[in-house]
Amino acid sequence: MKNNNSTIAAHNNTPTLAISDNRGLAIRALAYNRIHTSDAPEELITRNRYNAVGQLIASRDARLDSDNFRYQYPLGGAALRTDGVDNGTSMQLTNIEGRPVMSLDAKGTRSWVTYEPELGRPLAHQQQPEGGQKTVTDRFFYGENSAEHKAANINGQCIRHYDTAGLQQVDSLSISGVALQQQRQLLTDTLGPVNWFGEEQSWASRLRRESFVTRCTTDILGQLITQTDAKGHTQRMAYNRAGQLSGSWLTIKNGAEQVIVKSLDYSAAGQKLREESGNSVVTEYRYEAETQRLIGIKTTRPAI
């Protein structure tokens, strides 16, 4: 109890205060801190400045006597240039629709994004380190207006994404957008640079033949009912009438189903009251009646 009281005393009279201007913008943040109970609280001030339209243009914390961050904006509103004492200078250009098209980080690495002219969906990401070669790091392909893709609910969705790890492919989606079947193929060369330049037909040799497939089933609300991973292990979930998790099970490939969560009880406010695990360990939660804040957790297990 003595240690607990000393911990409480160290936090006494150390509030965090926020000060706003007449536009509701946070212009000051005051934090008070002490290490030992005998120390006077140290005041730490963060100062923010805004332009006429309410955009943050500079921020200064308690470490320095100058700005930590400075921001410049174009007419579109997204930050055009950011200067930071820790992360250097970065810039980002957007198109008329607000989508990023080119960026430059503090290391001199340039990045570009190419979009479809009509729908604005991303088609490719390109990257060029300072003094290095320009490469295509990502390519995106979308479901076509075909009977096959409509049946799998992937019409117009991103179904193949070539990235720096290989190929991520979506085979079918639920009505709520949850991936029902997806697969991953990894690169054959994991050490060399990744460049998805050219036509898709020429990339097959860069990928390993093995595909890691994940399959799911969902309910009408889009919540997972079962999920089978690439190793063949299956998770199963159950829900109550309110859509809250009521139990879960795990089946290791070629094994028997095991109980992970045996039961769950909730309050009328949706807060977890009691959870019994598959090994019969019970965890109970208590909440303050007035504020509904968590005030206690008790875990018990049966005697061996």
Predicted regions and their residues:
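Beta-strand elements of repeat-based all-beta scaffolds
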Residues: 1-304
